[in-house]
């Protein structure tokens, strides 16, 4: 009887867990739809900025070797790389399966790779998971940003990327790389590594049928264009990462719900078997008692 009570208690516990994971799955599904739409819109805008950059690339190529213009230093790849800044995004919350693993593994591998080349790598961490992981590994973080990956904010994204751009312009770093796990579709996430700074001018010419007219000239346009380019790449990465996080959490909760269902089924079978054995034992005892009274 005590065994039956224990199994019944387990069934109730697992069933409650199933309800919780199913509710979290539904919440993640709703959030995913919203984040997916935001990611799609942001991607289109980011692609348009890149197209504009491609359109004026022929002008950039003409003036990119002008070392005196600070704006153009963002296009100069340094001959010797001594310091690299790595911005990476992880989730602020858990229960999202292996969403963070790809990013953390890639960042750890890049750390080893650059250290083997005697290149100093500085980490700018966005998201509680990544911050706690490298704190546990006792690896120093240059900057830590909490609550940004779970609630992308354009002004905060600008703050992150402006700090990296300023460090590049001031000679504190030679390269800036952005790493995040991005959204591909509802069941797949895709690791993205963006070598953000220095920018490589596109090796194409302006097309004859282009509808874009440049006013003012490329040198005057670069400052505002590059500012928007960096800011929106950072902001898009945050939105893209959030959509991927919701996708991963939806899958994780779906798997947990299915596992809970399977476990409840197993426990019900165990309960029925134990109950059947208990009834059989009681019947045998009753029959034995009747026989002994004859």
UniProtKB/Swiss-Prot annotation:
GO MF, any single term: ATP binding
Keywords: ATP synthesis, Cell inner membrane, Cell membrane, CF(1), Hydrogen ion transport, Ion transport, Membrane, Transport
GO cellular component, one term: proton-transporting ATP synthase complex
Alphabetized Pfam families for the sequence: ATP-synt
Compartments, as annotated in UniProt: Cell inner membrane
GO BP field: proton motive force-driven plasma membrane ATP synthesis
Highest taxon above the source species: Bacteria
InterPro entries: ATP_synth_F1_ATPase_gsu (IPR035968), ATP_synth_F1_gsu (IPR000131)
Keyword Membrane: yes
Keyword Cell inner membrane set for record: yes
UniProt topology in membrane: Peripheral membrane protein
Main location: membrane
Family indicated by similarity: Belongs to the ATPase gamma chain family.
PANTHER family given in the database record: ATP SYNTHASE GAMMA CHAIN, ATP SYNTHASE SUBUNIT GAMMA, MITOCHONDRIAL
Assembly and interaction partners: F-type ATPases have 2 components, CF(1) - the catalytic core - and CF(0) - the membrane proton channel. CF(1) has five subunits: alpha(3), beta(3), gamma(1), delta(1), epsilon(1). CF(0) has three main subunits: a, b and c.
Described function: Produces ATP from ADP in the presence of a proton gradient across the membrane. The gamma chain is believed to be important in regulating ATPase activity and the flow of protons through the CF(0) complex.
Name this polypeptide is given: ATP synthase gamma chain
Organism: Campylobacter jejuni subsp. jejuni serotype O:2 (strain ATCC 700819 / NCTC 11168)
